[in-house]
């Protein structure tokens, strides 16, 4: 009942997610004494985002028997499951500054956004399905093995303070994996933290963190009007349509964060809305996912109001399956 009330209260406190895990903490001693062990690996990487994928490719190319473990059902992390709409700048303003695998993946991904100029290096749109296929191909061609829908659950340490095994939860139950080298590419530092590495949460003594966002996409927009009409959002420019929607007071879940990119014919992808979330609390993250989807719907309603020429026939085609966590 308390959890349902907390979800219902979110509309009254937009963007603020309270931690509820403290009320639920009780102990249970596991009776299971043995689980299966897979100990054939040279390198085990936890997390299949850009860092995990490139680490897996590099290790496998050097001949290491490599396993890439990913909690979701796709590689790419925030660029695919998280639906971040564009690459951050790849240049110093004149020339590309990221080489090797990063440049190769970036160049390949541009084939999935044919409307982008070939020489563009900064804020290039991402087609998440196309990018996903690139990671699948490059990782598997390198010889690395991929295990999807498998989440790190625990870390077993040896007496000399090194990792003895990692425990993963998936459809087979709890499974232990052993390797000679372990790489933490979780994005949250889970493997390192659960191995006993020290860490600091947040950017101040109170543990404050940057706000999170849930990305989403709109389909059936008017691309011509989107490209040639007024810019939807410019930071601190209150003449842009988004500020008009916020000032109206009709859309309490909409704030002045609305980065957006055309990712295909009549489809834009948006990094929009802010939520203050304890990103170490699974209950808070769960509530943020619900609130993020509500925000996506309300952003569309707001855009239909202030920019009907672009959005009158649009609909929410997808919301991300991974929360955009900045801290």
Where are the language model's segments positioned?
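N-terminal Rossmann-like FAD-binding beta1-loop-alpha1 element of flavoenzymes
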Residues: 43-64
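C-terminal segment of N-terminal export signals and the immediately downstream linker at the start
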Residues: 14-43
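N-terminal export signals
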Residues: 1-19
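Ligand-binding pocket scaffold of soluble enzyme catalytic domains
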Residues: 51, 80, 172-175
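Soluble non-cytosolic domains of exported or imported proteins
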Residues: 50, 125-130, 286, 290-293
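Conserved N-terminal/central alpha/beta ligand/cofactor-binding core
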Residues: 4-7, 58, 64-65, 70-156, ...
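Flavin (FAD/FMN)-binding glycine-rich loop and adjacent Rossmann-like elements that form
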Residues: 30, 34, 105, 149, ...
């Amino acid at each position: 009942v308390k959890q349902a009330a907390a979800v219902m209260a979110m509309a009254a406190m937009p963007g603020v997610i309270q931690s509820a895990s403290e009320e639920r903490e009780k102990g249970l001693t596991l009776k299971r004494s043995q689980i299966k062990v897979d100990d054939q690996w040279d390198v085990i990487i936890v997390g299949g985002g850009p860092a995990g994928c490139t680490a897996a490719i590099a290790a496998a190319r050097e001949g290491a028997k490599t396993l890439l473990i990913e909690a979701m059902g796709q590689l790419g992390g925030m660029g695919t499951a998280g639906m971040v709409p564009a690459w951050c700048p790849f240049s110093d303003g004149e020339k590309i500054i990221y080489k090797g695998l990063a440049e190769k993946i970036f160049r390949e991904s541009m084939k999935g956004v044919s409307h982008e100029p070939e020489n563009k290096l900064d804020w290039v749109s991402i087609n998440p399905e196309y990018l996903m296929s690139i990671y699948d191909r490059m990782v598997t061609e390198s010889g690395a093995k991929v295990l999807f829908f498998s989440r790190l659950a625990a870390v077993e340490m040896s007496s000399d303070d090194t990792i003895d095994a990692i425990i993963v939860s998936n459809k087979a139950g709890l499974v232990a994996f052993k390797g000679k080298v372990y790489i933490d590419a979780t994005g949250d530092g889970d493997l390192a933290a659960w191995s006993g590495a020290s860490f600091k949460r947040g950017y101040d003594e109170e543990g404050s963190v940057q706000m999170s966002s849930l990305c989403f996409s709109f389909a059936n927009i008017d691309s011509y009007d989107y490209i040639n009409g007024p810019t939807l959002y410019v930071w601190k420019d209150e003449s842009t349509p988004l500020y008009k929607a916020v000032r109206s007071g009709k859309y309490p879940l909409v704030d002045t964060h609305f980065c957006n990119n055309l990712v295909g014919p009549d489809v834009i992808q948006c990094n929009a809305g802010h939520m203050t979330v304890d990103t170490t609390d699974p209950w808070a993250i769960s509530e943020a996912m619900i609130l993020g989807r509500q925000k996506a719907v309300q952003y569309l309603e707001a855009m239909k109001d202030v920019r009907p020429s672009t959005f009158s026939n649009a609909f929410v085609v997808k919301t991300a399956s991974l929360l955009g966590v900045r801290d």
